[in-house]
């Protein structure tokens, strides 16, 4: 997927070729088994030729001063006109959806073991800074800023290829309580 035509711009290539990246998912579309609902909104509704045309998911060192663990989760997305709220502009609600996805991934992958179930979004505040053009490329980033018991706070941003900060978010995730049955199932 790193060779997807939409990712051949100098901006995207500078991101992709960073040697510190640890790529997780490289897919244009289908990445989960057909018999599961895992991430079904993205899987069946958004990963289309006019929606999210291509995406890369990766981790890398985070340079934000408030990064709790020193790493960030990233999504590089190629967006089509099927995500528009107004012609040429991605629907504002899509920013919230992407923030929940990238921040949730960060929270889930930053949880201490044993990780059995992903954390749930408790609150999310999204500040919209700039419209996202479509078609276009964006980079969503998220990093953990605090952990307290089962509570995980994460910050995130969406930036476009023109250098615009399009949205910021602060989220609170709550890790599930683990029962003895949950732990036994893991053995």
Region annotations inferred by a language model:
Residues 1-134, 146-187:
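Terminal targeting signals and extreme-terminal segments of soluble enzymes
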């Amino acid at each position: 997927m790193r060779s997807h035509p939409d990712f051949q711009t100098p901006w995207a290539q500078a991101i992709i070729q960073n040697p510190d990246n640890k790529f997780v998912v490289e897919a244009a579309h289908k990445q989960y088994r057909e018999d599961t609902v895992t991430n079904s909104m993205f899987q069946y509704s958004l990963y289309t030729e006019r929606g999210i045309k291509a995406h890369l998911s990766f981790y890398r060192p985070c340079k934000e001063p408030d990064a709790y663990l020193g790493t960030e989760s990233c999504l590089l997305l190629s967006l089509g006109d099927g995500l528009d709220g107004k012609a040429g502009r991605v629907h504002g609600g899509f920013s919230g959806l992407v923030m929940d996805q990238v921040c949730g991934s960060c929270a889930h992958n930053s949880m201490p073991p044993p990780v059995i179930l992903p954390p749930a979004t408790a609150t999310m505040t999204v500040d919209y800074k700039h419209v996202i053009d479509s078609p276009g490329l964006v980079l969503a980033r998220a990093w953990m800023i605090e952990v307290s018991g089962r509570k995980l706070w994460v910050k995130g941003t969406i930036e476009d290829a023109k250098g615009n900060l399009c949205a910021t978010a602060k989220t609170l995730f709550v890790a599930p309580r683990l029962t003895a049955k949950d732990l036994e199932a893991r053995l």
